[in-house]
Amino acid sequence: MATFIAPVAMAQYPQLTEEAKQAYQKMMSEERRRSDEAWAKALPVVLKEAKEGRPYISWASRPYDLPQARIPAFPGAEGGGMYSFGGRGGKVITVTNLNDRGPGSFREACETGGARIIVFNVSGIIKLESPIIVRAPYVTIAGQTAPGDGVCIAGESFWVNTHDVVVRHMRFRRGETKVWHRDDSFGGNPIGNIMIDHCSCTWGLDENISFYRHMYDPSEGQYESKDLKLPTVNVTIQNTISAKALDTYNHAFGSTLGGENCAFMRNLWASNSGRNPSIGWNGVFNFVNNVVFNWVHRSSDGGDYTAMFNMINNYYKPGPATPKDTPVGHRILKPEAGRSKLDHKVYGRVYADGNIMEGYPAITEDNWAGGIQIETQPNTDGYTENMRSNRPFEMPYIRITSAHDAYDFVLKNACLLYTSPSPRDSTSS
């Protein structure tokens, strides 16, 4: 369970001792070395397949930079990532044990080069000692193939640093409270063509699940670069849970999301103090038919002066940790422009309609009657009406229902695992 902070508190990063910093650097240095070794083996296969029709496009920054399939990734796929190739047509790799690494492990399957479909003949908890970094493109992770109660990735982060990735019916429980390592349960530097479906992401130490940008290094082979910060493109997160982020660092946050041609629908954000979600990129942010429950000091916020928001038919349900009779307690969205480099204030545009704020009938009737709140900055009076759009911005295909129907659907179906006699574990319930 997350331990909630007072509504006035803001995110703070831990003050690390030199010993803790050295422990983190040692762990990541070793993992980078191992990942580089795996990538050196995978890259020739990736380049060979690129010549055969599966291009590797690490520099993609626009939706049309990445080719897309002619048919959806699976029946029911929607949004910007619906035409991801994933591992379609590639080899099938079976995970045969719950080991952190080695033959038959989930890590080995993820680090393998070439188009691949990862299936499981084991179920249980895969306890990681260091992050898994997926660098080779064209992969489908089919968690629904696991027997019993499915598979849970725990102990460390799962990072996607490539394109054309489909992940379904998986649990990511970062957990662990190593004071020297704070990160997401599920994140990374995703390039694009990303489809996340029916996953449960909890116990993050930064956010539970975040997809919005990738850091591109033209020299390749490196993990961090200040050269180019590019958007993730063609991304969908659907039917997924982001909940119960850990407050070890006063940072119990749900998600940072965004990118170009992105869509986030029929998901549940529950019992995270903030970032439910936060918008981490410009362009059009499509947030449709989601349920947000029990936030503390932040519901949905972010973006910049170039951002556009489609906030359509979502259900906001204040919980026991949500402050009553304060603006944040009935906030649908807080657009921001505080990081703008301009010498004058300009905010993005917002289309907000059909959202329910439980317990606030006036806001439910008119989302602009207190639900859309400008950031707290000097000289912002008068901007709210200028942000308002009376029509939705262009978005990828999303099957839209009413907020009431979305609430019922999400509570019954988000993170529902195929074949399991217990479709949700206690953390997802």
Please provide the spans of the model-predicted regions.
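Sec/Tat signal peptide C-region and signal peptidase I cleavage site
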Residues: 7-11
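Acidic Gly/Asp/Thr-rich repetitive segments characteristic of extracellular carbohydrate-active
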Residues: 74-118
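Intrinsically disordered, low-structural-confidence terminal and linker regions
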Residues: 12-47
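Extracellular beta-strand-rich solenoid/capping regions of secreted or surface-exposed proteins
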Residues: 107-114, 126-140, 151-168, 174-191
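Right-handed parallel beta-helix
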Residues: 138, 143, 147, 163-174, ...
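Active-site/pore-lining binding-face segments in mid-to-C-terminal subdomains
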Residues: 297-414
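Bacterial N-terminal signal peptides
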Residues: 1-4
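Conserved small/polar residues in nucleotide/adenosyl-binding loops
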Residues: 418-423
